[in-house]
């Protein structure tokens, strides 16, 4: 049986009709060898979908991109690292608009066809003149093999670049989806200090692309947490240009379902890369709450455990302190009954019916010595479940974030 999709090389430039580039504009002072400005374009008309931070304090590029997205078609994304252009008032809005305008003029596009993203330190005005001066070189370097350089250009505290691409075989044709992302610290459900750009040569309406993108983000980036902090800048953008030469995908069609499955794989893999690159992380933990009365209860309990400082510290110390997990479940506001809760570490029972199991502590500690493990919490109140991917909390994380 032919697989629904398979991984290929090329990242965001793997789909037909996309190019990308990166240059050093000088935003990151003192880093002469670090690119800090990236560009992704579709050489053909395209539609876009996006999700933005739910933080009430939204950065200027988030506000400008949301407005541009509503205005119609999208052809390009320009992004900088080293400066968030957040909490910069009306000057920040104007600078974000100038950033889009500089790229639009160089490419012969309308301003609204360019989306802008920024990541970096909050509260500093964007050195827009440096960006404007760098745009001609940025456009000149556009390449169908430019995915990795953009992925590296948007990195901040990341330790490795994050990219992926897949090919989806269809009857007599194929479509491709590519993606890049950045993120390591300040990661929390509902998007946070995370940028993700996805491209596809599939043909799909803007409405359906938004529906699938939103659903995919909910199942991936909104299920990861490193430190519980939510950023002002996070953005996921998906651009589709229809160059795969297949009919437009619609709900109920096999191509639509295969595309949705492949898109979910792309976002989930990028989300896992982000969590594994968490600042100072030594443990990668999947928290799986099942048996909840409702989906919201499962989510509340999973997120409470995943964001608990005490739980995360215990994981760093390789201590199977299930009491801290019980405590977090209890204050999560999810419906629970203490005497019905079971807790497992990689399938090894730690708590049975709310009481200590007979499993030797050394056996549980052996599980926590692994870099990756799963904590399963069964509430035995229903059939709803939810998963969150999280990490431990280390002295290295504290040291890294003592100053910027």
State where each predicted segment sits.
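A structural signal for small-residue-enriched, beta-sheet-centric alpha/beta enzyme cores
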Residues: 1-80, 84-94, 104-404
């Amino acid at each position: 049986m032919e697989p629904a999709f398979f991984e290929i090389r090329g990242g965001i430039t793997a789909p037909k009709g996309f190019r990308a580039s990166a240059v050093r504009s000088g935003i990151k002072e003192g880093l002469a060898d670090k690119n800090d400005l990236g560009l992704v374009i579709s050489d053909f008309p395209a539609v876009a979908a996006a999700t933005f931070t739910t933080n009430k304090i939204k950065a200027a590029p988030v506000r400008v991109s949301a407005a541009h997205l509503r205005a119609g078609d999208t052809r390009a994304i320009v992004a900088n690292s080293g400066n968030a252009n957040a909490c910069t008032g009306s000057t920040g809005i104007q600078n974000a608009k100038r950033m889009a305008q500089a790229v639009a003029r160089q490419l012969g596009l309308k301003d609204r066809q360019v989306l802008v993203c920024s990541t970096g330190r909050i509260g500093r005005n964007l050195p827009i003149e440096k960006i404007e001066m760098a745009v001609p070189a940025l456009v000149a370097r556009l390449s169908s093999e430019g995915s990795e350089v953009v992925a590296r250009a948007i990195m901040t505290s990341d330790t490795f670049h994050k990219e992926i691409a897949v090919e989806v075989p269809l009857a007599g044709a194929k479509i491709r989806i590519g993606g890049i992302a950045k993120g390591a610290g300040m990661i929390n459900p509902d998007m946070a200090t995370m940028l993700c750009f996805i491209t596809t040569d599939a043909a799909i309406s803007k409405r359906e692309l938004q529906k699938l993108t939103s659903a995919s983000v909910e199942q991936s980036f909104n299920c990861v947490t490193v430190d519980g902090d939510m950023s002002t800048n996070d953005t996921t953008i998906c651009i589709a240009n229809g160059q795969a030469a297949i009919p437009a995908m619609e709900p109920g069609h096999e191509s639509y379902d295969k595309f949705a499955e492949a898109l979910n794989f792309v976002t989930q893999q990028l989300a896992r890369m982000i969590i594994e690159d968490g600042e100072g992380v030594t443990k990668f933990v999947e928290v799986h709450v099942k048996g909840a009365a409702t989906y919201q209860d499962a989510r509340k309990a999973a997120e409470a455990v995943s964001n608990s400082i005490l739980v995360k510290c215990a994981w760093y110390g390789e201590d199977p302190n299930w009491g801290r997990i019980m405590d977090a479940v209890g204050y999560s506001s999810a419906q629970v009954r203490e005497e019905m809760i079971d807790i497992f570490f990689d399938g090894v029972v730690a708590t049975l019916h709310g009481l200590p199991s007979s499993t030797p502590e050394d056996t549980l500690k052996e599980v926590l010595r692994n870099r990756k493990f799963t904590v399963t919490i069964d509430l035995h109140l229903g059939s709803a479940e939810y998963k969150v991917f999280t990490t431990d909390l280390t002295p290295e994380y504290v040291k890294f974030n003592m100053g910027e």
